[in-house]
A protein has these predicted regions:
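Active-site gating/metal-coordination segments in enzymes
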Residues: 113-171, 177
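Well-ordered alpha-helical segments embedded in enzymatic catalytic cores
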Residues: 52-56, 154-157, 317
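N-terminal binding-site loop/beta-alpha segment at the start of enzyme catalytic domains
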Residues: 1-126, 133, 165, 183-186, ...
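Short helix-coil transition/hinge motifs at the ends and kinks of transmembrane helices
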Residues: 93-94, 139, 269, 287
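Active-site mouth loops of central-metabolism enzymes
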Residues: 39-52, 136-152, 181-186, 304-311
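Beta/alpha (TIM)-barrel catalytic core signal, keyed to glycine-rich beta->alpha loops juxtaposed to Asp/Glu
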Residues: 2-24, 149, 156, 173-366
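Residues at the N-termini of beta-strands
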Residues: 35, 67, 166-169, 210, ...
């Protein structure tokens, strides 16, 4: 397995060695992270897609992207394995070292293994039920599980799939979204604290550097929604568990020119003052990665997005997201080489200044 993790020196070397505009890196937790990342969500669980994802990750890294995002349930574990192969080949070829890239994955959804031809429930019973990793009642109706025994097992599987000794960031995946139909909010928060305790332990063991929450609804909806979470409360929980140097430093949420709640919705509170989730994250020192930049292609249709900056739709979408104050990087799902090339043209131009971005938002919302 590949040892190491992203470091300030390694990521700075990556930034210096890349041919992209130097403004296209954000400094967070002393790491230099590209302001576009590659995501690996979609695709068939077959060998052709394995090759496409592996090559897309390699092409992205060689084009100046050092943020790579995946999840154990993406393509039933094959996404993680494709990422792992890409990283191994890049390191073997001397193109990068482990300390130059930031790799995140997600655990929480129960998944099978696409490389094993077996019925889903048979696999779950054999791999998780019989060994006692999960017991009756642990898995919700949404095929989600956040017991510490399950998440500990899944982290080890993710590390094995990725061929990494240490993961830079492990997200708890859609936790309240996957749990709230079956457990009370109070019970959920108790369980979340146990997960944070587990992840602090895994930091001590050297298996992860940071942990976070990859979400869909909870940080975008209003506080009367059962899925709503106040980021200030979650950070306070992390401090209670891990002290001031706790590892809860990142969230992920959907954000684009259609899903604009992260920017415009004042659903969060900081010292009782209404703020957006992006404003809250900045104040609390939480890094934000964003998903679905193109709404899985729907935003790229002619006439869907407003015109600005004379950029093609895909670049316009990325420019808007990565220029938003508080966003570290949109995560772009891309497999075909021509899509990678087109999307990463954005790395040749700097993000918008805060002033220009705020003027654009004013224009678009007036």
């Amino acid at each position: 397995m590949i040892s190491g993790f992203a470091t300030p020196k390694g990521t700075e070397t990556f930034k210096q060695n890349s041919s992209v505009n130097s403004l296209n890196f954000n400094d967070f937790e002393n790491l230099h992270l590209s302001n576009v990342g590659i995501g690996t969500y979609l695709g068939e669980p077959d060998t052709r897609t394995d090759e496409l994802v592996k090559n897309a990750v390699k092409q992205s890294v060689l084009s100046g992207v050092n943020v790579i995002d995946t999840a154990i349930n993406y393509r039933a574990q094959k996404a993680e394995r494709s990422v792992g192969k890409a990283i191994s080949e890049l390191i073997e070829d001397g193109k990068i070292s482990r300390d130059q890239i930031f790799v995140s994955s997600k655990n929480g959804y129960v998944t099978n293994d696409a490389d094993i031809q077996e019925d889903f429930m048979q696999y779950v019973m054999r791999e998780l039920g019989k060994p006692g990793i999960v017991k009756e009642g642990d898995i919700t109706s949404g095929y989600h599980c956040m017991t510490t025994s399950f998440l500990s097992d899944q982290l080890d599987r993710s590390l094995k799939n990725l061929d990494l000794e240490c993961l830079d960031l492990m997200y708890l995946h859609n936790s309240i979204e996957g749990q709230i139909k079956d457990v009370s909010k109070e019970q959920f928060l108790e369980n979340l604290k146990s997960v944070f305790e587990l992840y602090e332990q895994k930091r001590d063991e050297g298996k992860i550097k940071f942990y976070g929450m990859a979400t869909w609804e909870c940080f975008r909806v209003m506080n009367d929604n059962s899925q709503f979470l106040l980021l200030e409360d979650i950070v306070e929980m992390a401090k209670n568990v891990g002290g001031e140097n706790h590892g809860f430093k990142f969230i992920q949420l959907p954000y684009n020119m259609n899903y604009d709640q992260a920017l415009l919705g004042k659903n969060q509170l900081i010292q009782n003052k209404p703020v957006s989730i992006l404003e809250s994250a900045v104040t609390l020192g939480i890094g934000v990665f964003t998903s679905v930049p193109f709404m899985q292609g729907r935003l790229l249709s002619p006439g869907v997005m407003p015109d600005f900056n004379d950029l093609k739709p895909s670049l316009r979408a990325l420019q808007f997201i990565r220029s938003s104050p508080g966003v570290l990087a949109p995560l772009v799902g891309q497999k075909l080489s021509e899509h990678v090339s087109e999307n990463l043209e954005i790395m040749n131009i700097p993000p918008m200044s805060n002033e220009d971005f705020l003027q654009l938002v004013k224009k678009l919302t007036s």
